[in-house]
Structures are given as C-alpha cells and as structure tokens.
C-alpha cells in the first residue's frame, strides 16, 4: 500500500536507488497504490552516470509491497520491501535489467516487458 510521501527502492538499473511517491495516478481522489499501479515519483537517491538523476520526476510501476496482496484463490503474498520500476510514457521499463522478484499481478496489468526481464515472478 503506497501513498504520497512513501519511499520506495528502485528495482532496475536506471541509476536511481530510492524514489519518493509524489502522486498515485488513477483519479483525483485515489489515495493508495498497490502492485501493478502507476505512480509519479521523485528520485531521492541515484548513482552517478545513470539514466536518471537525483531530483528527476519519473513515472514508475509498483512491483513489490510490504502490505500483503490477496489473490483470487484466497492466498496472500507480501514482500520484505516496497519497490518500483521506472517506466516511460509507453509503460515500458527505462532500464534494461530488473532486480528481485516481481508479483504475478503485473501480468494482468499488461506489463509484459517487466515480466520477461524479471528473474523471478511470484
């Protein structure tokens, strides 16, 4: 469950390490984002020589949340950290690698490029 001012790890190789959620996209009263939702974020920590710099405003898709997600079969899945992957305007990842597992819910939201790059889909 991600809301405004939430800090997230970045799970790709764009150069950003941490981002801060500025806005949850999807309507003016939308408060929370879960796995597969798109947010607008500000880069708070970045490594030198990366694609994005500190202070950049980026679009990102949430790939892992500490808050558990209920699945249709009744099972739950939760991760040890909140993480996002930076995307472009066409919902394709800006980076060329994805680090760590991603949730299966991304497949239902048509983030196929992220699914194919991820080392593990849970």
Swiss-Prot record:
Entries under InterPro entries matching the protein: Ribosomal_uL14, Ribosomal_uL14_bac-type, Ribosomal_uL14_CS, Ribosomal_uL14_sf
A Pfam family of this chain: Ribosomal_L14
GO biological process: translation
Cellular component per GO, a single term: cytosolic large ribosomal subunit
GO terms of molecular function: large ribosomal subunit rRNA binding; structural constituent of ribosome
Gene3D superfamilies: Ribosomal protein L14
Presence of keyword Ribosomal protein: yes
Keywords from the named record: Ribonucleoprotein, Ribosomal protein, RNA-binding, rRNA-binding
Keyword DNA damage tagged: no
Function: Binds to 23S rRNA. Forms part of two intersubunit bridges in the 70S ribosome.
Subunit text: Part of the 50S ribosomal subunit. Forms a cluster with proteins L3 and L19. In the 70S ribosome, L14 and L19 interact and together make contacts with the 16S rRNA in bridges B5 and B8.
Family: Belongs to the universal ribosomal protein uL14 family.
Name by which UniProt lists this protein: Large ribosomal subunit protein uL14
Annotated organism of origin: Syntrophomonas wolfei subsp. wolfei (strain DSM 2245B / Goettingen)
């Amino acid at each position: 469950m991600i809301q405004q001012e939430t800090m997230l790890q970045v799970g790709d190789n764009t150069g950003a390490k941490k981002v801060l959620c500025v806005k949850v996209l999807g309507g003016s009263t939308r408060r929370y984002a879960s796995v597969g939702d798109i947010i607008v974020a500000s880069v708070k920590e970045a490594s030198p020589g990366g694609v994005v710099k500190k202070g950049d405003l980026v679009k990102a898709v949430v790939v892992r949340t500490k808050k558990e997600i209920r699945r249709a079969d009744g099972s739950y899945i939760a991760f040890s950290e909140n993480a996002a992957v930076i995307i472009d305007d066409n919902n394709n990842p800006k980076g060329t690698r994805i680090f760590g597992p991603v949730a299966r819910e991304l497949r239902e939201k048509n983030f196929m490029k992220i699914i194919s790059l991820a080392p593990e889909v849970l």
